[in-house]
C-alpha cells in the first residue's frame, strides 16, 4: 500500500539539510549516506549520493527520472553471479 498523500514523502532530515546547504553554496560534492529509505525529491536532481549497500558506498547520480523513488533502489545489496550450468555430459 502506498504512503498517504497527506503525510508527504519521507526523507531523513539530516540528508535534506546537507542537500539544502550544498544548494545554497552552489557546490555539488558527493553526499555519503546510509539512508536507503529516503525518497528522492526534485531538490536532489544533479547531486551525487554515496548510498551504502551493506558493504560499500555505491555512487548514485540523481536525474529527473528518479524523483519519487527511494535511494536504496539504485544501490543493489545482492550480487547475482548467475545460475550454475547443468553439465550432464561430464557426470557420465
UniProtKB/Swiss-Prot annotation:
Coiled coil: none
PROSITE patterns xrefs: RIBOSOMAL_S19
The keyword Ribosomal protein is assigned to this record: yes
An annotated Gene Ontology molecular function: rRNA binding
Superkingdom: Bacteria
Keyword annotations: Ribonucleoprotein, Ribosomal protein, RNA-binding, rRNA-binding
A GO BP annotation: translation
Pfam families on file: Ribosomal_S19 (PF00203)
CC per GO annotation: cytoplasm; small ribosomal subunit
Stated role: Protein S19 forms a complex with S13 that binds strongly to the 16S ribosomal RNA.
NCBIfam families, per database record: rpsS_bact
The family this protein is said to belong to: Belongs to the universal ribosomal protein uS19 family.
Protein's name according to its UniProt entry: Small ribosomal subunit protein uS19
Natural source organism: Corynebacterium diphtheriae (strain ATCC 700971 / NCTC 13129 / Biotype gravis)
Source lineage: Bacteria, Bacillati, Actinomycetota, Actinomycetes, Mycobacteriales
